[in-house]
From Swiss-Prot:
Monomer. Its EC number is 2.1.1.186. The gene is rlmM. This is Ribosomal RNA large subunit methyltransferase M. The keyword Membrane does not apply. Catalyzes the 2'-O-methylation at nucleotide C2498 in 23S rRNA. The lineage of its organism: Bacteria, Pseudomonadati, Pseudomonadota, Gammaproteobacteria, Enterobacterales. Belongs to the class I-like SAM-binding methyltransferase superfamily. RNA methyltransferase RlmE family. RlmM subfamily. S-adenosyl-L-methionine binds at S188, C221, P222, G223, G224, D240, D260, D277. The active site is at K306 (proton acceptor). It is an enzyme of class 2 (transferase).
Length: 366
């Protein structure tokens, strides 16, 4: 199997294609991407027969920025007979995957696919029963086995394949289902909440998003991101010339500092989190983030990089490479991840976690 399907935000197919082509080549997997504008997905086709399997096994899904999901597929099933769509799908999956732990019948995230989504929901139950009977699925859901994907691109027209549960998005269609909290000051709050779900394993939340931590929000007004930190009982310094929502100030957990986020320097050395969602050139934001990390002013950071109109993948890659180079130069070991989240628009969200510094005596090590 030489094809891989990647879901992405509609309008960002070219970026997703450029990224998978680049990162596949680093694994010595060569091929080409099929791109249809505003379709919400990309198909990468390798030149060697087992290239698809190699990518979903060896290319870390967490290293992809523009992909929401990644799975290997066989040939496109066309013109499924309306009276029996199940038999051809079961036949295609037999021999491709054994004892999958979960079934996801999905569509791309487009307006055109909304009607098709209703069909997928109804179709899932009888298809799951048939796949269990055929041995393609286990008799119970388990996260330890591969996920079986059936991806409809049109009525009666689908790709079938699988992903590995330790190297995929755990979410249906690659989208976390989050509800906007009615008391949050702005919808941007969902970006940070989604970032926590994507970048921080659920079993580490109690330790890394803990009560009583100190956090800084640069460019905080009106407080959408501060809201998420307050909700987790952190003490937050919100830095912005613009006013904060009164509901946040009333909690007593927020200190509003009326100054420019680029000029602010912290006066304490135990800041666990710095978050930043400022509308500014990505290179300028990347330089500021690198400064915070190199100086040990925070342990972890989540920030947004606004994307230019063209060469978006190249721009983000340069920004991340700059941050990595600064960390390397100063002997700081860190994990860097970036993803265009479902709640992001013309931007990507980056998470950096300092692990240790080669040189002792930084502010966060005293």
């Amino acid at each position: 199997m030489n094809k891989v399907v990647l879901y992405c935000r509609p309008g960002f197919e070219k970026e997703c294609a450029a990224e998978i082509t680049d990162k596949a080549a680093r694994l010595e997997v060569f091929g080409f991407a099929r791109v249809k504008e505003d379709s919400g997905y990309v198909i990468f086709e390798g030149y060697q027969q087992d290239d698809g399997e190699k990518l979903v096994r060896d290319l870390p899904f967490s290293s992809l920025i523009f992909a929401r999901q990644m799975f290997v597929v066989g040939e496109l099933l066309r013109d499924l007979p309306p009276e029996d769509r199940i038999t051809p799908i079961v036949g295609m999956l037999q021999g491709m995957v054994e004892k999958g732990g979960e079934l996801r019948v999905e569509v791309a995230d487009t307006n055109e696919s909304k009607e098709l989504m209703k069909f997928c929901r109804k179709f899932t139950v009888p298809l799951r029963a048939a796949l269990r009977e055929a041995g393609v699925l286990t008799n119970y859901e388990t996260p330890k086995r591969p996920v079986v994907h059936v991806f409809f691109i049109a009525p009666g027209c689908c790709y079938t394949g699988y992903s590995y549960s330790n190297n995929n998005s755990p979410f249906y269609m690659g989208i976390p289902r989050l509800k906007f909290p009615s008391d949050a000051p702005s919808r941007s709050t969902l970006k940070l909440e989604e970032a926590f779900h994507v970048f921080i394993p659920a079993d580490e939340w109690d330790e890394r998003l803990a009560n009583g931590m100190y956090a800084v929000d640069l460019g905080a007004c009106p407080g959408g991101w501060t809201y998420q930190l307050v909700k987790r009982n952190m003490w937050v310094s919100s830095v912005d010339n613009g006013p904060m929502a009164q509901s946040l100030m009333d909690t007593g957990q927020v200190t509003w500092l009326r100054e420019d986020g680029f000029r602010y320097r912290p006066n304490r050395n135990n800041i666990s989190w710095m978050v930043c969602d400022m509308v500014e050139k990505p290179a300028k934001v990347a330089a500021l983030m690198a400064q915070w990390l190199v100086n040990g002013w925070c342990r972890e950071t989540i920030f947004n990089l606004k994307l230019p109109m063209k060469k978006r993948y190249e721009e983000v890659s340069q920004n991340l490479a700059y941050i990595q180079a600064q960390l390397d130069e100063h002997g700081v070991n860190a994990q860097i991840q970036a993803r265009q989240l479902y709640h992001d628009r013309e931007e990507v969200t980056v998470h950096v976690r300092r692990l240790w510094a080669a040189v002792g005596g930084r502010r966060d090590e005293r």
